[in-house]
Curated annotation (Swiss-Prot):
Belongs to the gastrin/cholecystokinin family. One of its GO terms (cellular component) is extracellular region. InterPro entries: Gastrin/cholecystokinin_CS, Sulfakinin. It is found in: Secreted. The keyword Cytoplasm does not apply. This is Sulfakinin-1.
Amino acid sequence: EQFEDYGHMRF
């Protein structure tokens, strides 16, 4: 998935 919340950054 592209819109996953990676700690603090969103891709």
